[in-house]
């Protein structure tokens, strides 16, 4: 489950991250199980300031805080405030969209080779306080992830190593899944697919849906009883790790799925 979380951490919700942490100051209401609308407003405001900072508009008087909608015209992102229209100051930061050009459901922007996705969903609960019906801002976060075979997962004996190798194999084959229960409900977690959009020139656009996965093998001074040599001695654990994890990677090399 945690390996899946790490692999899927390439794209994360800015709104969830803000609402659930102390980036925004906590109040008594926000600490309860109930939704705090005041905190929700603060999350939206923070999100708008984030967009203002990294994706400023041509018409600075309008500003991200005042926009009411989006549309795509001739490959350009048009940002609306009622009857007023403006564009990004740096138009190259608009990459593509999802949905209809005159009523997009998502806008994809890029800054310093990292992407963000503005989700527009008037039916979402989180969009009810938003004049542009933005329900979330998804940010490209963990571009790479290191999967450990030693200390951080406390892999000591043969049984532990088999679990590590099985998880790594599932990640490389793309079929790793985890089922768990929470609050009386059963959930299944699996690897995220690529993210699909329409580029500014009207063609299909795909972005990696998962982190680029790296593997950390054990140092060569350690040995492990999982495999015994002819003389009965334990195999050097680093060699065992290198051989088995590399063999698992062959599945990914054939279909080129890692970081997707």
Each predicted region: which residue ranges?
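Catalytic alpha/beta active-site cores
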Residues: 1-260
């Amino acid at each position: 489950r945690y390996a899946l979380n790490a692999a899927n951490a390439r794209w994360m919700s800015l709104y969830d991250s803000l609402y659930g942490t102390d980036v925004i100051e906590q109040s008594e209401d926000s600490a309860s199980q109930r939704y705090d609308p005041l905190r929700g407003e603060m999350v939206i405001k923070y999100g708008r300031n984030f967009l203002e900072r990294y994706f400023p508009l041509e018409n600075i008087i309008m500003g991200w805080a005042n926009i009411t909608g989006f549309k795509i015209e001739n490959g350009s992102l048009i940002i609306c405030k009622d009857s007023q229209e403006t564009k990004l100051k740096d138009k190259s930061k608009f990459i593509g969209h999802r949905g209809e050009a005159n009523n997009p459901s998502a806008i994809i922007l890029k800054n310093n080779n990292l992407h963000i996705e503005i989700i527009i969903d008037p039916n979402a609960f989180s969009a009810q306080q938003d004049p542009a019906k933005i329900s979330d801002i998804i940010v490209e976060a963990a571009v790479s992830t290191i999967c450990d075979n030693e200390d951080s997962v406390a892999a000591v004996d043969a049984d532990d190593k088999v679990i590590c190798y099985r998880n790594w194999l599932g990640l490389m084959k793309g079929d790793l899944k985890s089922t768990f229960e929470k609050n009386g409900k059963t959930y299944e977690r699996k690897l995220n697919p690529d993210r699909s959009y329409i580029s500014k020139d009207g063609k299909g656009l795909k972005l990696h849906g998962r982190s680029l996965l790296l593997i950390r093998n054990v140092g060569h001074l350690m040995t492990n009883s999982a495999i015994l040599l002819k003389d009965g001695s334990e195999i050097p654990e680093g060699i065992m790790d290198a051989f088995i994890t590399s063999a698992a990677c062959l599945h990914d090399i054939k279909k080129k799925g890692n970081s997707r």
